[in-house]
Regions:
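N-terminal carbohydrate-binding/catalytic regions of secreted carbohydrate-active enzymes
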Residues: 51-127
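Aromatic-lined, polymer-binding surfaces characteristic
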Residues: 67, 99-179
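Residues that flank catalytic or metal-binding motifs in active/ligand-binding sites
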Residues: 12, 40, 162
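Low-complexity, Pro/Ser/Thr- and charge-rich linker/hinge segments at domain boundaries
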Residues: 17-40, 44
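Extracellular fibronectin type III
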Residues: 3-24
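Mature N-terminal segment immediately following signal peptide/propeptide cleavage
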Residues: 37-57
Length: 179
């Protein structure tokens, strides 16, 4: 309940009844499920058969210009590496918790920046079909995956950020990927 002015007020009791004749949940067999899946990859960001229309409809969108300009600018900037994490202040910290907090904060600066850069390349590729963006995104994502081996790759959400980025790249680059 909610306490207001020293007394507790309760909401009304809500309920539902399960009748014996209600439909039961019965998932389809695996064979039925598989037979209904589309034969092409069900893209999330842009369906492949609607891609050209998406590109032409986005021609005048300010977001398109922003993504392309940012991608062009980022192409000229070398990728930061996780080993570039600023650890210079670690020696002055007196306990493990403080050192871990500093390392987490400093490594997230690099992870966050490169995650955004790779996402910009993915979106710029979807807006243009320019292979330069595809190649740069893949190069950076493949490098970022290697960061898991670094002692500087610290943080609660680094792996989920990489997983999200890889999922986006898989969706966008599906037709270009090989085994």
């Amino acid at each position: 309940g909610y306490v207001e002015g020293g007394s507790t007020s309760w909401s009304e009791v809500l309920k539902f009844t399960q009748e014996p004749h209600q439909d039961r949940f019965s998932p389809p067999s695996f064979k039925t499920f598989i037979s209904k899946l589309p034969s092409r990859h069900p893209r999330v960001l842009v369906a492949s058969d609607e891609w050209d229309t998406f590109i032409s409809q986005s021609e005048d969108a300010p977001e398109r210009a922003w993504y392309i300009a940012r991608a062009e600018k980022t192409l000229k900037v070398p990728m930061k590496h996780i080993d570039d994490t600023d650890t210079s202040k670690m020696a002055g910290l007196d306990n493990e918790v403080k050192r871990n907090a500093l390392l987490t904060r400093e490594s997230r600066r690099i992870v966050d920046k490169e995650e955004v850069n790779a996402e910009v390349f993915v979106r710029a590729y979807l807006l243009t079909k320019d292979d330069r963006y595809y190649k740069e995104a893949m190069k950076r994502i493949l490098e970022m995956i290697k960061w898991e081996e670094s002692p500087n790759f610290v943080g609660d959400f680094n792996e989920s950020a990489l997983l999200s980025l890889c999922s986006m790249a898989y969706d966008a680059f599906y037709d270009k990927l090989d085994a």
